[in-house]
């Protein structure tokens, strides 16, 4: 299971939201490209970027920061936020981005996503952000009636790289992941899954390792790294060794 550090961009700065609320954001002083380089030096093998401004409005405004990040590191970059057209994807690929994440368009234009996954096999990631099991779109501002599980089943036949599944109610809380939700997703797809939302400790990471054999490819971590709950090097050292006896029991998972 890979640990993937996250950079959320707003007005060219690194920020973190609390439960996806744009009115509850925290700014971090380090420049985005400096943060990316720092994490690469810590041992990160990939960086996850979200353009929050574009996710909200559909208009990309952080491209300068994105390009600086790509030029500053020598590891793959995956990016999401407001990606709703072939033209935008080509533009991001021209910057050197490795994979793009499609969220809102996965619901609003499924045929486009199907076409793009064929045109760019294994370079399209489907981002599924859910609250109470139902998918949210437009930067988490619009709640749909579509179940996350239904969307995963539908897109599992496409040539996508992976699913990123985020439980909005845990995102930015540092209170642990929604393992019940993650388990449900893993049970219905053979596509690699990346979990996001809620990681606040090494114990949270260790607890997720029980899902590796079920298809959990990685976990995205943001706030915990920014607030020095642990470092990438610390987490990587632990995740790369057999620590099954250290995995805490999550009673909800076994319910």
Swiss-Prot record:
It is found in: Cytoplasm. GO terms for molecular function: 1-(5-phosphoribosyl)-5-[(5-phosphoribosylamino)methylideneamino]imidazole-4-carboxamide isomerase activity. It comes from the Bacteria. HAMAP family: HisA. GO terms for biological process: L-histidine biosynthetic process; L-tryptophan biosynthetic process. Its main location: cytoplasm. Its EC number is 5.3.1.16. It catalyses: 1-(5-phospho-beta-D-ribosyl)-5-[(5-phospho-beta-D-ribosylamino)methylideneamino]imidazole-4-carboxamide = 5-[(5-phospho-1-deoxy-D-ribulos-1-ylimino)methylamino]-1-(5-phospho-beta-D-ribosyl)imidazole-4-carboxamide. Keywords: Amino-acid biosynthesis, Cytoplasm, Histidine biosynthesis, Isomerase. The active site is at residues 8, 129. Pathway: Amino-acid biosynthesis; L-histidine biosynthesis; L-histidine from 5-phospho-alpha-D-ribose 1-diphosphate: step 4/9. Pfam families: His_biosynth. GO terms for cellular component: cytoplasm. The gene is hisA. It comes from Prochlorococcus marinus subsp. pastoris (strain CCMP1986 / NIES-2087 / MED4). Belongs to the HisA/HisF family. This is 1-(5-phosphoribosyl)-5-[(5-phosphoribosylamino)methylideneamino] imidazole-4-carboxamide isomerase.
